[in-house]
Amino acid sequence: MSHGHSHGGGGCRCAAEREEPPEQRGLAYGLYLRIDLERLQCLNESREGSGRGVFKPWEERTDRSKFVESDADEELLFNIPFTGNVKLKGVIIMGEDDDSHPSEMRLYKNIPQMSFDDTEREPEQTFSLNRDITGELEYATKISRFSNVYHLSIHISKNFGADTTKIFYIGLRGEWTELRRHEVTICNYEASANPADHRVHQVTPQTHFIS
């Protein structure tokens, strides 16, 4: 499969640990409800339709009966159509505690039916991933680049050295906007207003932005 890689300088930081009721944390990652699952594609999945199963409620992220594993090599490409416009603020990628865990994630926006050949182009943002087996690490996006997203593509370009890649959960945090003729409805899928009230580790990883 064709693919390219590019990186910029960056580092990691973990926010202070914060407590939050599970139902509020679940609401924060509620954008999965705004995905058009019937049209969602996962390229190079070993079992057809399994890629849809990793977009699930945050409180079900530890359910290991639902996962996606790559087929021919370590790459996966998710094409995610939303039912409205999204302002994407953060992503969680949860995998196995071994070399099958993704090590790099590349995000593209508004390219429906994206193929692996299309990943030759520059992504909106690239993340170097840490192993996350609990679904607690959030990778913060450059919000100005993801403020009007109707289609998100997530390219898992490599893992930590295994032949295949396995993912149990992908969490998306942000705002969803439904455009109507007479009104605009905005659903804010974020944690509580007071950041000291909930627990989340936020990671600012290596990134690459289009200039």
Curated annotation (Swiss-Prot):
The modification Phosphotyrosine is found at Y189. Residues 1-20 are annotated as: Disordered. Residues 20-192 form the PITH domain. It comes from the Eukaryota. One of its GO terms (biological process) is penetration of zona pellucida. Pfam families: PITH (PF06201). Its main location: cytoplasm. Keywords: Activator, Cytoplasm, Phosphoprotein, Transcription, Transcription regulation. GO terms for cellular component: cytoplasm; sperm cytoplasmic droplet. It is found in: Cytoplasm. InterPro entries: Galactose-bd-like_sf, PITH1-like, PITH_dom, PITH_dom_sf. Belongs to the PITHD1 family. Promotes megakaryocyte differentiation by up-regulating RUNX1 expression. Regulates RUNX1 expression by activating the proximal promoter of the RUNX1 gene and by enhancing the translation activity of an internal ribosome entry site (IRES) element in the RUNX1 gene. This is PITH domain-containing protein 1.
